[in-house]
């Protein structure tokens, strides 16, 4: 909750709402896959889930920061176009970061022993889901809520 308050102040309440729904998506999908794989939830899984939340939130904040930066820099384009451009600009960074993290976590999975396998498996699932949500869920949700429920003081008023 403290992180969502930070995002709401740093960016906007719609950014916070989009990121919270994306984080909820990440945790629930990861838990669902762990349930399907019959992996027991223990302290290492809880630690992995918290790591996933931090990792996914970091990815989302990078995208949101680029959106905010481009909103100030690019005048005249539609908000939807600016969000799309921002996602395209951060896509390379997001994919490369996720790929390199997956390499390290894969080493943990294969060589870490039985204790670290469930932790590493949870991270692998969570990184894939978190990367997906930071690109395809958080920003579109932010845009949707901004368009559907605009803040009254920011609506253009006709004279």
What spans do the regions from the language model cover?
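Selective detector of the "anchor" transmembrane alpha-helix that sits immediately C-terminal
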Residues: 1-10
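Membrane-helix interface segments
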Residues: 11-16, 43, 79, 115
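Hydrophobic transmembrane alpha-helices and their membrane-interface caps
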Residues: 15-68, 125
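Pore- and gate-forming transmembrane helices of large, multi-pass membrane proteins
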Residues: 19, 76-111, 121, 127, ...
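Transmembrane alpha-helix detector for multi-pass membrane proteins
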Residues: 46-66, 92, 96-104, 132-139
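Terminal, Lys/Arg-rich, intrinsically disordered segments and adjacent short helical elements
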Residues: 69-88, 92, 139-159
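Hydrophobic alpha-helical transmembrane segments of membrane transport and translocation systems
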Residues: 111-159
């Amino acid at each position: 909750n403290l992180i969502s308050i930070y995002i709401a102040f740093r960016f906007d309440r719609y950014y916070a709402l989009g990121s919270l729904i994306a984080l909820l998506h990440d945790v629930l999908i990861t838990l669902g896959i762990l349930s399907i794989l019959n992996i027991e939830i223990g302290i290492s899984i809880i630690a992995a889930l918290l790591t996933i939340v931090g990792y996914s939130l970091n990815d989302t904040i990078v995208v949101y920061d680029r959106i905010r930066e481009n909103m100030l820099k690019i005048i005249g384009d539609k908000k939807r176009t600016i969000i799309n451009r921002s996602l395209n600009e951060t896509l390379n960074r997001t994919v490369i970061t996720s790929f390199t993290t997956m390499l390290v976590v894969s080493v943990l999975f294969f060589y870490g022993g039985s204790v670290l396998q469930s932790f590493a498996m949870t991270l692998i699932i969570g990184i894939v889901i978190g990367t997906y949500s930071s690109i395809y869920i958080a920003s579109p949700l932010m845009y949707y809520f901004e368009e559907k429920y605009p803040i009254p003081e920011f609506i253009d008023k006709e004279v």
